[in-house]
Amino acid sequence: MNKIYNNLSIENLIKTDWFEQFKLYQKEEILEGLKDNLDVSIYANPEYKWSQMSEIRKGLQDNLNVSIYAKTYFNRAQMKEIRLGLKNNLNVSVYATARFNEYQMKEIREGLENNENISIYLKSRFNEYQIIEIKKGLKKKLNVSVYANKKLSGYKMREIRKGLENNVDVSIYAKPYFNKKQMREIRCGLEDNLDVSIYAKSDVYWKQMEQIRLKLLKEKNQ
């Protein structure tokens, strides 16, 4: 924002050609900032969407170091997660990077707020679904290293986490080559103390696994 325009009154500013380059909602964000005596030059940039401007303006209202997230490559939701982290005095540097989407940022921010060992899910660039499962395991003090594997989807991680919660030998099915439904059938069999070795094979379709498991369970209960 040109210093000449910065010194104009709001009434005169809205009459300038400079102000006319902005769209309606962008103009509203600039005017809101001026009314609150904020340094709108930080976000008075036509490259910002109005929603991005709004997040920067909110940060300025709270006297936050908005320079950390006042970047055009962060979308509104990413900016919000960084702003909330700054507001709570968190070390946002660990997630204030474009390589994390807003959902990943949210999970990392909440992990910092809860004093979790976020290093476990930061180093391998897990997606938000994987991070959620790792966080659930950490919260229950499980050995998450068993399933904190980038090759395992969030759904597969969930099956392994449930097995750990029920104290079964998850090593039998904690393999990337089993799909989530196969893992579920093996886990359910282990929880019922069945001999899952009969069907715990990657070439056995999950529906076949289910049929074998139910047959074994029926025989056991006779």
Language-model features and meaning:
Residues 1-222:
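General marker for long, soluble alpha-helical cores
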